[in-house]
Amino acid sequence: MATGRPATGFGWRVYGLGVVALSLVCLAWGGFDPGQAAPKALPDRAVLAFAAAVFMVVAGAAIEWRRTTAWAAASLTAYYALVVCVLMDGPGLVVSYAEYGSYSNVAEQLAIAAAGLIVYATDAQINAVLAARLTRLGQMIFGVCALFFGGAHFFYMNLTAPLVPKWLPPSQEFWGYATGFGHIAAGLAILTGVQARLASILLTVMFASFTPLVHVPILLVDVRFDLLPGSAGIGFVVT
């Protein structure tokens, strides 16, 4: 039996707006999202980057309109999973398979695909059993991604710690390790289903706190494309 289900909370709206914001910055900068590792020598790279950004604007905006939410989410899922993770980031992962950062970078893009899958499953007019399976698949994928996010904090503490405000006690390293552990704990909870909803909510709060504490202060000094916030919407969707 096909049934329509409301998308998780208001996470689908945050998710859609996040995609739109990211795509608008891509248009302003005239390039791909840094997580989309399109080769520099790619023919007509600027044109393709523009096309990708326009697609993301349209799809992200379509998420906000309930009549097109499901199809827009499906389109974003396919784009991030197949085009970004496989075609763009896949070759780099094969070449740099021994570097942890290669996996965490792919995980960042895969998490966006996982959130799109969950939005699609919870909104589309599809069989309830299939919807539940797709939702769980998206949650499992995101759980694995969270493990990679946490691991990156430990592997690259020399890069993570300086992002923490110096005024935040007890130390930058403490919060670097604490947030890394938080990612891993949340990922395990989501994967096992033990206190998964609580873990997702807390992870969302942590993602959201990164914006005023980490991203905004850095962006005010150094406008870096790769520091644009966008994880909170994904956390909202997973909850």
Question: What is the meaning of each model-derived region?
Answer:
Residues 1-31, 46-58, 62-155, 174-181, ...:
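Extended, low-polarity transmembrane helix blocks
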Residues 28-41, 155-175:
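Membrane-interface interhelical connector segments
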